[in-house]
Amino acid sequence: MIISRRQIRELAMQVLYAYEVRKEKVDKVAKGIIPEDVVADIKAKDFIFKIINSVIQNIQDIDTHIAKHADNWELNRMAIIDKNLMRIAIAEMLYLDDVPPKVSINEAIEIAKRYSTDKSSKFVNGILDATYNEVKSKGVLHKSGRGLVDLPAKKERVANPFPSTPPKKPENVPNPFSTPFKKNSSEPIRNPFEGNKSPQPPQKTLRRKKK
């Protein structure tokens, strides 16, 4: 069975939800929620426990970020699902180097749409976006590999207008430069991309006038 990262995040959210409600040890809670086929998948198991442990070990710092950007909302008044989705996303931002921050935010929003109220996705998006902008401006994001995907490069690089490897030509799509035409006319014109020499005027043939 192939399990997606979104499904792993959903399971992590369920574990954290039950952990908060039941007040039991996280290992016991996780054992009753995470399916055996996920535990048998080394990559899936590693990712889900990275998320869960990152949240639990850093929950005070994570909750501080949430509370800072939640206008007039106390943590204990927030929906438990929303709160744990935000905890997961912030944990990924700060402690999982290989996850792009915007992916973490988007995943939390989409899962909120499925499991929580109609207004939850906007609420989650607002707090996570504000948190992301804050930690990015302070330079506390430490990403590597795939985690660098949506972060700005240190130096702006200008794309080469003449790349060494041209893009693959789509099939069955006519080349706009193969047979150029004048606008609103079927008369072909000279291809401006063909050859390096400037067009030469036609040579006139001189004839002697008869006396």
From Swiss-Prot:
Residue spans of biased composition, Polar residues class: 175-188
Any one GO biological process: DNA-templated transcription termination
InterPro entries, sorted: NusB-like_sf (IPR035926), NusB_fam (IPR011605), NusB_RsmB_TIM44 (IPR006027)
Disordered: annotated span: 152-211
Entry's Gene Ontology molecular function annotations: RNA binding
Keyword Iron applies: no
Pfam family, one: NusB
GO CC field: cytosol
Family classification: Belongs to the NusB family.
Function: Involved in transcription antitermination. Required for transcription of ribosomal RNA (rRNA) genes. Binds specifically to the boxA antiterminator sequence of the ribosomal RNA (rrn) operons.
Designated name of the protein: Transcription antitermination protein NusB
Organism: Chloroherpeton thalassium (strain ATCC 35110 / GB-78)
